[in-house]
From Swiss-Prot:
Location of this chain's protein in the cell: Mitochondrion matrix
Residues annotated to bind FAD: 73-82, 91, 155, 184-186, 354, 360-363
Organism name: Arabidopsis thaliana
MF GO annotations: ATP binding; cobalt ion binding; copper ion binding; dihydrolipoyl dehydrogenase (NADH) activity; flavin adenine dinucleotide binding; zinc ion binding
Post-translational modifications reported in the UniProt record: S-nytrosylated at unknown positions.
Subunit structure: Homodimer. Part of both the glycine cleavage system composed of four proteins: P, T, L and H and of the pyruvate dehydrogenase complex containing multiple copies of three enzymatic components: pyruvate dehydrogenase (E1), dihydrolipoamide acetyltransferase (E2) and lipoamide dehydrogenase (E3).
Enzyme class: oxidoreductase
Protein name: Dihydrolipoyl dehydrogenase 2, mitochondrial
SUPFAM superfamilies referenced in this protein's UniProt entry, alphabetically: FAD/NAD(P)-binding domain, FAD/NAD-linked reductases, dimerisation (C-terminal) domain
Organism lineage string: Eukaryota, Viridiplantae, Streptophyta, Embryophyta, Tracheophyta
């Protein structure tokens, strides 16, 4: 790495000035569930409404920075949508369903004979629930360790420095704070004319807890969540049809990778109806009838399924907080408007995560939370939304960071492209997972890496070499000259980097 790059690294860490000073002693005025919540009769330095990834991480970081902190969470369990009914339970089911699929269809190719493979759905769901329970308890343990006050209840603003909380025990308390952070996350976006009952017409929450494997499943929406949940039930035996209004699945994905990805899902018998609009639904019978037509208009078709999953995106959860009472500005979509320091237009009130503009991702919310409380503590905080990775946790996975080829063309940026397929990677061939590729986009003049896109069974783990490289303005040659262990899947990144500025060795 060049000396200039090393200097940038040193400057970066010096300017962050992150402190881990111990917190002040806390005084607890009364006890709620689990015995470590406070009424907040003494002013807090920081009060956080919402205990999801953004909220609980902000709370812990604030306490580590010596700020007296209270976190309010309506669910009664920390972790938000991600931990309770999103990222974590879906990954548990994705893994369990993949294990079943491998045992049924792949083990024999590796000399492992299994006479009978069956799905024990109750046991599979129980494993998922156990994982969630253990992790939520773990976050509570972190709150205790860091002396974060935890109030279980629904909070809404009384003033810019006061939050009224209806606790899960039926009490009402007022929590006061010098700085209040809104971290209430997002909720499922509904579609006109479709009522989610979480039985036959389900959201992602209901799709995580189906008590029977549907023979036919229709997924409305070809985004991350819809494709992941469609994959779970497809592996377990459901006939899956994905209905999408747009012309492509996961529209924000790099086009070349997306085409490969769709072909892979189609090989897994997932069907796609793109450029298709849902115009009606009938769930009065035993199953569900979905009426669709071409997005541009035309002849209607009726689709039948046992279960319909509505996965048409998410909307910020900002209603019911009495934001208008204190004058906090939101946009037309209900997102809270903030500046680069996460401050709203109301002094002392901040917002992070899914309730503000930007990608609705748990890890982005976590970074927001850390940066926000660093600003509050008088330190340097920073989140670069152009360098936040995204992962689709199907099989294979797709992971990306930075710009797509389509974005660079639109912006008029001259770039080089380097690609390397996993079919030429020795580790991938040895373990029979050679599907996919690594694609690197770099500035044509400077060789600075602008985007990296990976399709591979473990793309979500591989992408972080690229995330680090992009955050430190590395070039493709920088990656190419780093020794990678052999044989590993990560060698494909090195080879793609070599292909970007020169030529790969193994192609």
């Amino acid at each position: 790495m060049a000396m200039a790059s090393l200097a940038r690294r040193k400057a970066y860490f010096l300017t962050r000035n992150i402190s881990n000073s111990p917190t002040d002693a806390f005084r607890f005025s009364f006890s709620l569930t689990r015995g470590f919540a406070s009424s907040g009769s003494d002013d807090n330095d920081v009060v956080i409404i919402g205990g999801g990834p953004g909220g609980y991480v902000a709370a812990i970081k604030a306490a580590q920075l010596g700020l007296k902190t209270t976190c309010i969470e309506k669910r009664g369990a920390l972790g938000g949508t991600c931990l309770n009914v999103g990222c974590i339970p879906s990954k548990a089911l994705l893994h369990s369903s993949h294990m079943y699929h491998e045992a049924k269809h792949v083990f024999a190719n590796h000399g492992v004979k299994v006479s009978s493979v069956e799905v024990d759905l109750p046991a599979m769901l129980a494993q998922k629930d156990t994982a969630v329970k253990n992790l939520t308890r773990g976050v509570e343990g972190l709150f205790k360790k860091n002396k974060v006050n935890y109030v279980k209840g629904y909070g809404k603003f009384l003033s810019p420095s006061e939050v009224s909380v209806d606790t899960i025990d039926g009490e009402n308390v007022v929590v006061k704070g010098k700085h209040i952070i809104v971290a209430t996350g997002s909720d499922v976006k509904s579609l006109p004319g479709i009522t989610i009952d979480e039985k036959k017409i389900v959201s992602s929450t209901g799709a995580l807890s189906l008590t029977e494997i549907p023979k036919k499943l229709i997924v409305i929406g070809a985004g991350y969540i819809g494709l992941e949940m469609g994959s779970v039930w497809g592996r377990l035996g459901s006939e899956v049809t994905v209905v999408e209004f747009a012309a492509d699945i996961v529209p924000a994905m790099d086009g070349e990778i997306r085409k490969q990805f769709q072909r892979s899902l189609e090989k897994q018998k997932m069907k796609f109806m793109l450029k298709t609009k849902v115009v009606g639904v009938d769930s009065s019978g035993d199953g569900v009838k979905l009426i669709v037509e071409p997005a541009e208009g035309g002849e209607q078709t009726t689709l039948e399924a046992d279960v319909v999953l509505v996965s048409a995106g998410r909307t910020p959860f900002t209603s019911g907080l009495d934001l208008e009472k204190i004058g906090v500005e939101t946009d037309k979509g209900g997102r809270i408007l903030v500046n680069e320091r996460f401050s709203t237009n109301v002094s002392g009130v901040y917002a992070i995560g899914d309730v503000i503009p930007g990608p609705m991702l748990a890890h982005k919310a976590e970074e927001d939370g850390v940066a926000c409380v660093e600003f509050i503590a008088g330190k340097h905080g920073h989140v670069d939304y152009d360098k936040v990775p995204g992962v689709v946790y199907t099989y294979p996975e797709v992971a990306s960071v930075g710009k797509t080829e389509e974005q660079l063309k639109k912006e008029g940026v001259s770039y080089n492209v380097g690609k390397f397929p996993f079919m030429a990677n020795s580790r991938a061939k040895a373990i029979d997972t050679a599907e996919g590729m690594v694609k690197i986009l770099a500035d044509k003049e400077t060789d600075k890496i602008l985007g990296v896109h990976i399709m591979s069974p473990n793309a979500g783990e591989l992408i972080h070499e690229a995330v680090l490289a992009i955050n430190y303005d590395a070039s493709s040659e920088d990656i190419a000259r780093v020794c990678h262990a052999h044989p590993t899947m990560s060698e494909a990144i090195k080879e793609a980097a070599m292909a970007t500025y020169d030529k790969p060795i193994h192609m």
